[in-house]
Amino acid sequence: MNKSTPANALKGAALALAVSTVLTACGGTDSSSDAKAEATPSATPATEVRDPLVATFDGGLYILDGESLKLTRTIELPGFNRVNPAGDEDHVIVSTDTGFRVLDATAQTFTAIEYEGAKPGHVVRHAGRTVLFTDGTGEVNVFDPADLGKGKKPQGRTYTSAEAHHGVAIELAGGELLSTLGTEEKRTGALVLDENNEEIARNENCPGVHGEAAARDEAVAVGCEDGILIYQDGEFTKIDAPDDYGRIGNQSGSDASPILLGDYKTDPEAELERPTRVSLIDTEKKKLRLVDLGVSYSFRSLARGPEGEALVLGTDGAIHVIDENSGRVERKIPAVGSWREPLDWQQPRPTLFVRDATAYVSDPSEKALHAIDLETGEKTTSVTLPESTNELSGVVAGH
């Protein structure tokens, strides 16, 4: 475990308690195709939808009622599109060919708000702010999601990376902005800026930096090809992987726990590694534990339960519920049939999205979507859709 103390390090009391962070995990560096993204609604929505979910399919978006799973709206949108919670009760961020667009999922229509830029990448929600990272330009946009309801682009903070790269950024409760460092060819670590975008900390001991998550007490982590890098209370700490190459590229955090859930890959030469182990990173003890599930999973398989429990959708079709403190698999909740991760990261595969105590799991092979009660393990609702879905998300208020 290695520490680096930043110049002008923050003194005094620890940072404010963290609130939950939702990670946008990804399996590659491109976030859209070359098709022009023009949204065409299939019909005029009659009423607002409750707790909407948004799923992508080849050619558009499905909007579903979060309680009944009724398909309430189909929006035609060419290209490879991605979806993430915007941070309020109504909106979802849609990554398209032209940039980030804001969908009013409750009203079932796109707003006029767009953050244009090539290769829109990670979307991060934390401490009352939503942060967008545009890979093609290195631009970071920060805004209060509560302002999205005003119908125009929120006033917010902007920062442009020294060089464009596949990156991620997060604004902390005290106004510090952590953003990754790199180029299109090489990513090396992260820096931290104060409220005036002046650098106050830096660590370049994180090769291949990718992904982000926050744990309790605002311990913010980014993944490396040889472990994980944590920023907390004004300083960086590196937790080394047990293998020379131990990549933790996707992570999921919870404000209910100091322990992060991550993937874990050990073969740098693999065209597609299908790992069976996940990582549990204790941000308090600065330790890393590996848990072997016995089955593989994908970057769309990681989530957290309402009490901080680690959830992994395995290729056996079950949600593996892991006690994040002991590393023990407590139970397996049947969700879908067995599946295999496709070589192309943009191709559909079963996806896990968790909101409160409900797990939503898509099954592209059956064109199905299921809602599962995490407490009872029972499927409460299922629906068959016209087309196979790819990404799955929904509105999530708060952080």
Description of each model-found segment:
Residues 67-76, 106-115, 149-161, 197-204, ...:
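A short beta-strand motif characteristic of beta-propeller blades
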Residues 38-46, 77-90, 114-129, 159-174, ...:
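Repeated scaffold domains used in trafficking and secretory/extracellular systems
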Residues 27-30:
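Bacterial signal peptide processing site
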Residues 22-25:
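C-terminal motif of bacterial Sec signal peptides marking the signal peptidase cleavage site
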Residues 184-305:
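Acidic, serine/threonine- and glycine-rich low-complexity intrinsically disordered segments
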Residues 48-57, 61, 84-101, 123-142, ...:
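Short beta-strand elements that form the blades of beta-propeller/WD-repeat-like
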Residues 362-399:
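Blade-level signature of beta-propeller repeat domains, shared across WD40, Kelch, NHL, RCC1
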Residues 294-337, 341-364:
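Loop/turn-rich, solvent-exposed surfaces of beta-rich toroidal or solenoidal domains
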